[in-house]
Each structure stands twice: as C-alpha cells, then as structure tokens.
Amino acid sequence: MNREELKQILPHREPMLLIDEVELKGENLAVGKYTVKGDEYFIQGHFPGNPIVPGVIQCEMVAQTCSILLADQVKGHTPLFTGLEKVRFKKQVKPGDTLVMECSMTRSRPPFYFAKGRGTVDGKLAVTAELSFAIV
C-alpha cells in the first residue's frame, strides 16, 4: 500500500502520516517503511548539526504500521495509544535512513488491541516496543 492507499484506512494526514508504504504479510504481520528526508518538522531542532528522529516519533511510526493490521476496525475511527511498554532504542535514525517497521497483533479485547513492533535500519535493530491502543 502506498501513502494514498494508507489514507483510505488511517485518519492521519501530513505532517503526521509517518509511513510511506506498508505491505501485509499474512494475517498478522505488517511491514511498513518510512524514509527520513531531513526536512521533517520533528527533525528541526532535534538536534542542530546532529539530526536524529525522536524516539516518540519512531513509536508513532510503529503504531501506524500496526494499525494497518486492523484496517476494517480503523476505517472511520481513530486509533489512540493507551500504552507503550518495554520500549528500547538501539540505534539512532537519521536523515537518509529508511526505517523498516514490523508489527504483529498479540491479543485483542475490543476496543483495545495489543501489539509488538520493531524497527530496523539497514537490518540493524533501532527500536522495539509493545503497544496498546483503543479504536474509538
């Protein structure tokens, strides 16, 4: 799915649509990609001369990728974070990098959903997290 197809599912819009594409692999694995251009609002000032994608933005990228697994439930609704656990940042994500996110759902109790995700750059682990969110 490209950005235009993602907009048919997710309520996010620029500048907060933080995935470029997503591929569904089976029923419970979504693989998303985002290439950091360097002119994003979240890069400005974080940090001058050493731009790094903030960790909270990486978590949002993972969450948006996870939301695609629930396309039928998300359409017309808003997925909201209810929790982040076991978040770890292992590698800095910088302009020019492509963050590849892999997400799977671990359980659900509608309207609450639980997932785990990870992001890599050039095959090296950058971020891992367990997420929970509600669809309202």
Predicted regions mapped to residue ranges:
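Short loop/turn motifs at secondary-structure junctions and domain boundaries
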Residues: 13-14, 109
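A generic structural signal for short beta-strands and their flanking turns/coil linkers
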Residues: 18, 28-32, 43, 78-85, ...
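Hydrophobic beta-strand-centered segment that forms part of the acyl-chain substrate-binding groove
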Residues: 65-100, 134
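Active-site helix/loop of acyl-thioester processing domains in fatty-acid/polyketide metabolism
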Residues: 22, 53-76
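HotDog/MaoC-like acyl-thioester-processing domains
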Residues: 27-31, 93-97, 104-136
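Catalytic strand-loop segment that frames the active site of acyl-thioester-processing enzymes
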Residues: 14-53
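Short Pro/Gly-enriched beta-strand edge/turn motifs at strand-loop
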Residues: 1-6, 97-101
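Conserved positions in beta-strands of structured domains
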Residues: 20-23, 85, 90, 104-106
